[in-house]
Amino acid sequence: SLAEKELDPSLIEFAKDMPLSLLRQHSTDDLIHEMHQVGEWLTDNPGCYCAGAVDPAASAVRYTIVLRQGERRVGVFARITAAFSACGLSIMRANVETVGEDLLWDQFWVNDPELKQRQPESRIEEVCRVVTKALDDPDSVMPTPRRVWQTQGSKEPSSVLLLPTKVLFDNDTFDHQTILSMFTYDRPSLLSDISGTLSQLDVVIQFAKIDTHLDQIADVFYVTNLDGSPITDSDRQETIRNALVDAVRKPVP
């Protein structure tokens, strides 16, 4: 049982109130095994935990990233997505959980074009090194997105993108957090640009759920201001909305 392991106290608290989103994604044995690994890592290491595994059911690689957030309330998600983008990964789905006051437990399902030419273990270790560097050295330069080379005709003309980007704020569901929903067309490094924009605007991401379907992406963020208050000011909402729309329109390098 978990009680028989010398686990990090924050992990014990996490286990007492395990989010349903994590329970649905794992069998009990797999979840306990992962929690043991995370607990042992957090007990012996001050830095973040990063591990990956090929998920055949999703045709993707699932990365689990766990860290004590400490005083860092802004920019963690942005650094993770930038690290993935720098490695040439496309994020298909993500669940970002804030547990208690200090522990972040994030899961990402990514498409990795290099996996066919590489041993999965070495490739996953390489990606985790980039992620760990980005998180454990928060003052380091943000990883640079990998340049995407496009062949002629591979890029959809802007006229094909018929639906406008939508950015919605919901302050009715919760009184302590704002639900920020975003719907747009996917492109390389998009999530990295979105999360970087939120970080620059001092928007704190408490929870995130990312889904892609064909060429479209739906992002749902539970967010607050730096002081923990919901984002209710209409002018601030408009500033965030305009910045996100500009980030979506940012040309791919």
Task: Tell me what each language-model feature is.
Residues S1-P253:
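Regulatory modules associated with amino-acid/nitrogen control
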